[in-house]
Amino acid sequence: MTLAVWIIAAILALLLQPKLSLFEYPLNLSVAVVYAFGIKKAMQHSSATGSANVSAEIRATIFGAAVGLIEDVMTGSMIGPNVLSKGLTGFISSFVFRDIFFLWESSLGGIVLCLLTMADGIVVVGSRLLFSNIMIGGRAVVELIVIQAIMNIPIGLLVKPGQKDSEMEQAWSRGRKYN
């Protein structure tokens, strides 16, 4: 997918997440989009040895920070908490599936997206508590973060890493020879 398609997917996720809710808690679809971008880029930029270069992590971090900036601007709140949390989500998702987990399991994707959603919520709430004068109820925040994380598990089960560039080129050239 091209960068324009990813940006459109992120904007659609940001527009849909306040509209879709479970038990009156909004979804956190922006984390899922950044997560998907991170693991796809980690696999696309991997070298022949199996390890990706740093550009996958940098691209995922920049994309995540851009999504966070758009989210901060759209919500009208302080600019920064979502930039930090989505940037970290992009970096971690790219790093985790490149250097920590070498074999892909779909259940692993659900667990990692659940943990990243929790970390995203904690970073956003922590940043807002630290840098602004708002008071937030602890139980309500924990409920929101846990429900959003649980709702993102099915998305994490469905997202799969992309193929490596060399594998994609080989598959494309094989298909061209036979057609």
Which residues are covered by each model-predicted region?
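Terminal, non-globular segments
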Residues: 1-179
